[in-house]
Amino acid sequence: MPIAKFKSPSSHELLSKPLNTIEHEMRSTGTSGLPSISRRCSDTVDTAVVAIYAMYREFLGISKGAGLYVCPSTEEIPEMGMIKALNMLAGLLDTHRFMVKQERFVPEDALAQLQSWENKFTRHIIGPPFLIHRLLQFLQQTGRRIKLDKGSMVITLGGWKRFTGQMISRREFNLMCEEYLGLAPNGVRDIYALVESNVMAIDDEHQIKHVSPYVHFTVRDMNDLSREVPDGEKGVLGILDPLALATPGMILTEDIVSLVPGASPSGRSGQRMEYIMRAPSSLEFGCCAVNLEKKMDGTEAEEAACPVVN
């Protein structure tokens, strides 16, 4: 099933279970402004929650600490898939704070919160790359540095392309984390996920993404979707998701990826993937993080243009 079907007005036709069995509805809105709507029945939610926490434990190993969420809370945007997935991590932490409120992010407040947790908790920074990059740029521009803790992580989800089309360099991002947060590259973990699927691919300590063992990735020839390409070759990603009990279990995404050949240096088995780009034919070039950035930048521009009346 082409993933674009989830954006159509007839997306309810994808359901293989009655609407009264649907427990949860999740959305992701990219640059087109059209929401992709994914509905999950109770059985899917039950198994997906267990599966996602298993992935978090395997690749992040978090069971305590403090989470600085550089993103809005689920209270503000309860239906956004990216926020929902990141918020699940909060259940493994001792405490957490959301630093984006009413579409505004104040880096000074985020830094003050990190400093208040110093010597009390292992501090983790969690959010989409563009917002964590803003925090890093603030540290760079003000000449400030902080030293995170042993076991600290920067955890990203939401894609590396900004709404302007500009890419955030992963290499530059890693170097900035090392320079301004005192965090080695193996402490930076990126997550690939789709609201339309229950898949989650998380970086290991070598920054290679491991695919959830309960799904199967198939990479298809870009010129002939009936043909599967060998590992190491790029193509269009298809996902077989047996946890999707109310929606199609096989979807064709608009992402270009490759499967990493050979054995994993981490010793883990299973599929590993490298994300390359969004397909040129796609009407979207980003996910909900891109739309969030666009809205936040619009809010900041409106505030800057508003005259102060004494």
Where are these regions (language model features)?
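Active-site glycine/GP-rich loop and adjacent strand/helix microenvironment
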Residues: 65, 88-310
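Nucleotide 5′-phosphate-binding alpha/beta core
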Residues: 1-73, 79-82, 91, 103-104, ...
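Conserved nucleotide-binding/hydrolysis micro-motifs of P-loop NTPases
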Residues: 74-75, 196
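A general boundary/transition motif marking the beginning of the first structured unit of a protein
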Residues: 73-74, 165
